[in-house]
Amino acid sequence: MITSGSNPRIAQLRALHVGKGREAAGLFLIEGPHLLEAAFDAHITPRLTIFDPDALGRSVEGRRLLERILEARGAGAEALEATPPAIEKASDARTPQGVAAAVALADVMPDKLRQGRRGRARPLLLALDALADPGNMGTILRSALAADVDEVLLGPDCVDPFAPKVVRAGAGAHFHLPIRHGLTWAEIGARFTGAPAIEQVLVAEAAGHVAYDQLDLTKRTALIIGNEAHGVSHQAAALATERISIPMWNKVESLNAGIAASVILFEAARQRRASERGPA
């Protein structure tokens, strides 16, 4: 059992709190029973897990997860018992939940995840422009998966999608949603014109000319969401075929990026679901 916060395995997990550590190790940190359960459900086994068996043993869900951890260990995965203070030392969360693990970035590469998703003739893409807030990023990734977005493209100056706070807010989206990050706007533009070519590129902004729900979002569509404070950059705006807005009442001027993206993406999902059902 790991009892010391200076144990090499604890240091290995702590290194994943920062981007350079994640890049050097090829790993990212997941924390808490929900995320570890989500990884197992996605057939992803962490490269290293530390866990407190007493904490997990206090609930039915925790005991079930403990069985999966021990099963993975029996199959050769590294899973080590640790005391609560040791887990707290490894954790980025304010309130550690009895388990932390390191997952290989190679296991969530976008091309690998795309193999497990159905290809569509009318894809829905999401591009993020200098999105800085980790909570917003995680919320958007979670909504993108729920709304069946095909791929998320992250432009320059976006927060690292594998930062611990983003991963926690994403609530398991990272295990299913293809995310391409560190892209230039030229590379994103090339993705829009690749096969199948995107028919409309929408930029969401308060001064948009068209209400988001007045467009046909069943087309091959890309949505661009801009920086929380400054909106979309000139490079991103240059790709747009339409500027859209979300009508609001009672003198509310704007929504945060996470909510705005979710509203528009779920309208696209609604239209696509209705289109697949056909006329009543």
Question: Which residue ranges define each predicted feature?
Answer:
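N-terminal positively charged helical leader segments and presequences
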Residues: 1-94
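Active-site/ligand-binding-proximal alpha/beta "capping" segment
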Residues: 202-252
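RNA substrate-binding interface of SAM-dependent RNA methyltransferases
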Residues: 71, 85, 102-208
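Amphipathic alpha-helical repeat scaffolds
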Residues: 32, 132-139, 255-260
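Glycine- and other small-residue-rich loops at beta-strand/loop junctions that grip anionic moieties
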Residues: 2, 28, 129-130, 155-156, ...
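Short glycine-rich anion-binding loops that position phosphate/pyrophosphate groups of nucleotides
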Residues: 33, 54-56, 86, 106, ...
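Structured adenosyl-cofactor binding patch, chiefly the S-adenosyl-L-methionine
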Residues: 101, 143-147, 158-174, 234-280
